[in-house]
């Protein structure tokens, strides 16, 4: 991913996304996919340079997966408009494909590890945030694994989120 940096991805995100909650969501997904990239790199026995490059690619993908959503929120636009912007800015095809695959309605099947991880982390980050929002403090600090597992058993919880 030469040419793209986390800083340039953050700049692109903040150019298109003003909502602090969407920015927090992007950072949460970024952190989640980065952790999975680190684990995957270890499992694959990658050297430190290859592992760092993999982690960077996953991080940028997680950070940018919804960057266009605030301006282009409809299924006809998101993530299609974002994909075109990323292509114009030189982001690699695998990053763009992962971002396309995170939205079921695009019809892009999730095939690679990064595509599957992005989808899972996007869903999980949203669920954890919803769990925090029903706490009296509305704080992530009050959310633990037990409360998340409890909410996962409740089929009606966060259905409309």
Per-region residue spans from a language model:
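Acidic/His-rich, divalent-metal-binding segments that scaffold phosphate/diphosphate chemistry
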Residues: 1-75
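Residue-level signal for secondary-structure boundary elements
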Residues: 21-24, 129, 160
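Short, intrinsically disordered, charge-balanced linker/junction segments flanking boundaries
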Residues: 37-38, 157-161
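Divalent metal-dependent catalytic cores for phosphoryl transfer on phosphate-bearing substrates
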Residues: 53-157
